[in-house]
Design a protein with these regions (language model features):
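Short catalytic-loop micro-motif centered on adjacent basic/acidic residues
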Residues: 20-21, 50-53, 156-161
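A glycine-rich helix N-cap at a beta->alpha junction
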Residues: 40-55
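Histidine/acidic residue-rich metal-binding segments in metalloenzymes
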Residues: 61-228
Length: 228
C-alpha cells in the first residue's frame, strides 16, 4: 500500500517536486492530533510537502485556528461523496465551513443531492456509465453553490479537478477570491476512448468526460484561465 514515503518517491521519479497531501486517509486528518502525526510522518518524505486539514460537519470550530498552523496548505471540503467518509453535503454545513475557515478552502465540487437522484443510472460492470451518473450538472451545480457561498462570506475557494466546459466558463468569469485547478488525467484522456482502453483504471471522481470537455480544458490551460 502507498504511504507518504513511497508516494513521495514516486512523485520524484515522475518529476513532481511538491505535493499537498489529502486528508481522506485512515485515520482522516480532521483534528490537530492526527495533523501533527502527519507532520511527523512527513519527515520520511523525499519531496516538498504540506497537508490539508479535512473539514467535517462537526469540526468547523477548529477551522478558525489554522491560520498559523505550520505545514497546513488549506482546508479540504468534500461537497460530493468520493474516497473516504468526509462528506459535507448540506448547504448549512458547507456555509459553516466557509464562515469559520482561516485558510483557503479547496473543494471537491459535486452535488450530492443530484448524485443520489442519478445513482440509478449506474450499470454494474459498465464503467462507461460513470460519467453518465456523475454528469456535467452534478459538477456545475455544486460549483455555482460553492462560489455563491464563498463570495457572500468573502472567503477564498479553490475548486479542485475541474472537468466541465461549463465550469471553465463560469469560473473564468468569477475570479478574485475564486481559483481553480485542472489535473493532468483530465488533459490526457477523454471518454469513451479512455474507458475502452483502460476500463476501471480510468474511473475517478469527478469523471473523465467526452472530447468537448477535454478540448475546453485545454483551451483554459492555453489561455491561462486555470490557476493550478
Amino acid at each position: 500500500a502507498e504511504d507518504l514515503h513511497s508516494g513521495s518517491r514516486a512523485a520524484i521519479v515522475g518529476g513532481i517536486t511538491s505535493v499537498f497531501e489529502m486528508p481522506n486517509t485512515n485515520p482522516p486528518t480532521t483534528n490537530f492530533e492526527e495533523f501533527q502525526k502527519k507532520i511527523s510522518l512527513g519527515k520520511r518524505m523525499y519531496c516538498n510537502h504540506a497537508f490539508y486539514f479535512g473539514a467535517t460537519a462537526e469540526n468547523y470550530q477548529l477551522l478558525e485556528k489554522l491560520k498559523d498552523l505550520n505545514g497546513c496548505c488549506g482546508i479540504k471540503l468534500f461537497a460530493g461523496s468520493s474516497t473516504g467518509n468526509l462528506l459535507v453535503d448540506k448547504e448549512d454545513d458547507i456555509e459553516k465551513v466557509f464562515k469559520h475557515a482561516s485558510k483557503v478552502v479547496a473543494v471537491h465540487s459535486e452535488d450530492e443531492e443530484i448524485l443520489k437522484l442519478r445513482k440509478k443510472l449506474i450499470e454494474k460492470g459498465n464503467v462507461k456509465t460513470h460519467p453518465i451518473w456523475r454528469n456535467e450538472e452534478v459538477a456545475i451545480s455544486s460549483t455555482r453553490k460553492i462560489v455563491k457561498i464563498a463570495k457572500r462570506l468573502n472567503k477564498k475557494a479553490h475548486i479542485l479537478h475541474v472537468t466541465t466546459k461549463e465550469e471553465v466558463d463560469f469560473l473564468s468569469q468569477n475570479k478574485g477570491n475564486i481559483t481553480f485547478e485542472i489535473t493532468p488525467q483530465h488533459l490526457t484522456m477523454y471518454a469513451p476512448d479512455c474507458y475502452d482502453k483502460l476500463g476501471s483504471y480510468a474511473q475517478m471522481n469527478p469523471p473523465i468526460r467526452d472530447k468537448s470537455h477535454y478540448e475546453r480544458l485545454w483551451y483554459a490551460v492555453r489561455n491561462n484561465y486555470n490557476d493550478t
